[in-house]
């Protein structure tokens, strides 16, 4: 599980574009806390802290504690908006969570031991179909990443979700199929050779008819 962190915030008494622009001029950005059957809470958070959290990785899989108006609220970042040109954060949505909360999160998949995969040694390419997987997981036990060992994989082999060991209490959001995470694809040269061989075999078969 990723380490939690504390984020200090101020209540927002005004909303709207004018208020948001004023916040940004003062080094803050607008945000909202919602969920848990409570009224949404409009807050302002530090632009600098949010910028580094977003670009540091793991932002949407790490539970945070927001200190605002004398209260401590556990949250999980659910969404954020970036400036389309400069990639600067403009707004953040936080979901209220507790130790009993179960949430949907996208967790990255990491692959190890590529050098121990015969298919890759022969020139095969690791074709990643899904860089992350949506999981249903307790909010206090979100894994930083899922890991798969590529040792022994050959060209043409596939990695399915069933091959990845999920932590206790964690399930994949997609339950109706054993979806593919990655494959070991043949290199372009080998594909060309195989196609040429197949073509030659077809010609021989025709000649023999």
Curated annotation (Swiss-Prot):
Q: Name one GO biological process term.
A: translation
- InterPro entries registered for this protein in UniProt: Rbsml_bL25/Gln-tRNA_synth_N, Ribosomal_bL25/Gln-tRNA_synth, Ribosomal_bL25_b-dom, Ribosomal_bL25_C, Ribosomal_bL25_long, Ribosomal_L25_dom, Ribosomal_uL5_bac-type
Which Pfam families does this chain map to?
A: Ribosomal_L25p, Ribosomal_TL5_C
Query: Among the entry's GO cellular component annotations, what is one?
Result: cytosolic large ribosomal subunit
Superkingdom of this protein's organism:
Bacteria
Q: Which Gene3D superfamilies match?
A: Ribosomal protein L25, beta domain, Ribosomal Protein L25, Chain P
* Quaternary structure (record): Part of the 50S ribosomal subunit; part of the 5S rRNA/L5/L18/L25 subcomplex. Contacts the 5S rRNA. Binds to the 5S rRNA independently of L5 and L18.
What PANTHER family does the record tag this protein with?
A: RIBOSOMAL PROTEIN L25/GLN-TRNA SYNTHETASE, ANTI-CODON-BINDING DOMAIN-CONTAINING PROTEIN (PTHR33284), RIBOSOMAL PROTEIN L25_GLN-TRNA SYNTHETASE, ANTI-CODON-BINDING DOMAIN-CONTAINING PROTEIN (PTHR33284:SF1)
| Protein family per UniProt | Belongs to the bacterial ribosomal protein bL25 family. CTC subfamily.
**What name does UniProt use for this protein?**
Large ribosomal subunit protein bL25
The major lineage groups are:
Bacteria, Pseudomonadati, Pseudomonadota, Alphaproteobacteria, Hyphomicrobiales
